């Protein structure tokens, strides 16, 4: 990886692509690296520059100019922090969360009776993600306010997985109330120092001001083809704008407004599907060899 060379490393080779990551992120994904890299290096993720910096343990020197420093603990080879605080019922409630740099959501909260917060009044059912054991289902809602360190964030889109299915699929015995993912972390430059037990968060001011939004179309897309630029509807949520537009699983998207689908990547398509409540999206669709137009009216569902 770059100039990095490592011998005698343990690797896991999966014969079948269970996660189908390439299809859902729209770029070729050949593997995942985890604990061994993070444990042997100080890892800095610069989301705005799309850069990953590995610094040898002992060579990284923390300075306040690099951001705010927060303790982390490593359990079951995973990093956890107590730097997250929720606001509910007029009180601040610190929680322990997993720092999940491989997750696309902002915040995931365990949905079980023993937790100190309730499911929001307004939620939608959704497929929250995928693991080696299958699809993770649950609810999506909004948390009014939370803090990550000293930074306050409002109206965060949060995932609430079905407790039984989520616990079985995660398979971790570590006590935690949820996890934070890249939709939240991308608003910072993040440095993970497993060796000395801390993380550093340097805010990206423009990204901190961005609102938390969720897909307003109600459809999930997968990419296919050698260049991963052929886009198909993978799932349509009931009573969603996509369902109202007559879209079905297996439909191929040829044009999205004035854009040929082949000119867009997955992230750009989802950004178009977050353009605003009431916005119309014109689609050219192919189904079973037939081509037709349809209009999709975006709706903020949470």
PLM regions: where:
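Pepsin/retropepsin-fold aspartyl endopeptidases
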Residues: 1-302
